[in-house]
Amino acid sequence: MSDKDKDSAPCPDLEPQRNPPTSENAPDGGYGWVVTTSVAIVNGHSWGINAAYSVFLAHFLKEGTFAGATALMYAAAGSLSVGVMMIISPIATIMARELGTRPTMLTGAVVQSISLVCASLSTKIWHLFLSQGVLFGIGMGLLFLPSYGIISQWFTKRRALANGIAIAGAGLGGLAYSLATGAIIRNMGLDLAYRILAIVSAVANITCTLLIKTRYGAQATRLAFDTSLLFKPEYLLILGYGAFSMLGYFVLIFTLANYANVIGLNSSQASMIPAFFMLGQAIGRPIVGWLSDRFGRINLTFIMSFTTGILILALWINANSFGVLLTFALVVGLSAGVFWVNISPILVEVMGLTNLASGLSCLWVAMAAPSTLSAPIALEIYTGTGSYLGAQLFTGFMYIASAVCVFVLRMWQINRRIRDKVDSSAISGLTDNNEEEHGERQGWTLKCLRWETV
C-alpha cells in the first residue's frame, strides 16, 4: 500500500486534522446500508463466535476437558478474549492509522481464524488461554474496533437504527454459532468444531471487510485518546454505565448454558438457551435502535437497562425448567444488548461527534476489566455457594446500577439543554435575569421528572 493509499484510508478511532465529520452532511442511507450490512455480518462472525463460547464452556465443565482446570479457569479463558479485545484499542488505532481501516480488519480476520485453529490443538488449559483467550481477542479487536464508529459517519437521524441493525448481526451470529457449535461438538467432536468455525468466519469476514468504506478521506495524524475526557462528569457517568452493563452482560453471555446443565437439562437443550438469548438480541437491537431514534437514546437506554435488571431478578431466579429458561433467555435478550446499540449515539449526543473517536478509545480500554472479570466473578460465586442465586442477584443489580448511571446522565443532559436555552435567550435579549434564575432553579427539576426526548 502506498503512502497515498494510507492517507486515504481513515480510521473511525482517529480524529482527522482536516474536514472533520459533521452530522449535517451524512447521507442517512445510500451506500451506508451496504456498510451497515457488512459490519453486521462481521459482528456475526466475530461476536457471534465469542457468544458461542457459552456452549464450549458448558462442554468443558461437563466433560472436564483439560486436566486440573477449574470452573474459574474455563470462564476466565473465554472472558479474557473480550478484555484483550478492548484493551488493544490503542494498538488497533495505530494500525488503522498506519495501514488503513481495511488492512487492519483483514489482519483481524486472519488472526481470529488462526486462533480457532490453535484452540483446536489445545491440550492444556493454558493453551486455551493463549488461543481462544488472547489471540482470539486480538483478532476480534482488530475486526470490531475499527468498524464500530463507521456507522455514525453514514447516518444522522437513523443513526441508532443503523447501529442497531449492525449490532444485531452479533445476535444472529450468536444464534447460528451457538446452535451449530453444539451440534458439531456432539456429532463431530470439539476439534472439528473449532476448525469449521475458523474456515466459515474467515470467508465471511474477509469478504465483508472488502465492502466496508469510511466517508472521510483526510489523513488522520494524531491518536484519538484524549484522557482529558476522564475529568468530565458526563463522560464518567457513561463509563460507569458501561462498566456496570459489562459486569452483567457477559454473565448472561457466558453462563446461561452452564446454568442449564446445573438445573438438569441435556447438552442439546443447554445449547439452545444462549442461542435464544442471541435471537432475542437479533430481534431487539434494531427495535431498540428505532425506538431510540424516536423517543430518545438516553431514555431508551435507561428503560432497557432497568427492565433487564428486573427481568433477571424476577424470571431468571425462578427459571428451573427448560421452557421457563428458554422464555427468559429470549425475553431478556430483547433488552440486554442496549449498550452496544446506543453507546456510540449517546457519546455523539453528549460529547459531540468530534469527541466520538476519543470517547470510544477511552471507553474500550476502561471496559476491559469489567468485561474480563464478569463471568469469573459469577462462577466463583456459584462454586463458593453451590447455588446460582448469588450470581443471579449480582447480574440483576449490575444492570440496575447501570440504569441509575443513565438516569443521572439524563438529568445532566436536560440541565445542559436548559442552560443553553437560557444563555441563548439572554444573548438575544428575550429574557431577563429573573427568568434566567427561574429556568435554572425550577425548570431543571421539573423537566427531569417529566418525559422529555433525550
Could you tell me what each predicted segment is?
Residues 110-123, 209, 306-320:
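C-terminal ends and interior cores of transmembrane alpha-helices
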Residues 263-265, 269, 275-288, 292-346, ...:
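C-terminal transmembrane helical hairpin of 12-TM major facilitator-type secondary transporters
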Residues 60-61, 65, 95-96, 176-189, ...:
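Interfacial helix-cap and linker-helix signal at transmembrane-aqueous boundaries
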Residues 1-42, 190-224, 349, 356-358, ...:
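Intracellular terminal tails of multi-pass secondary transporters
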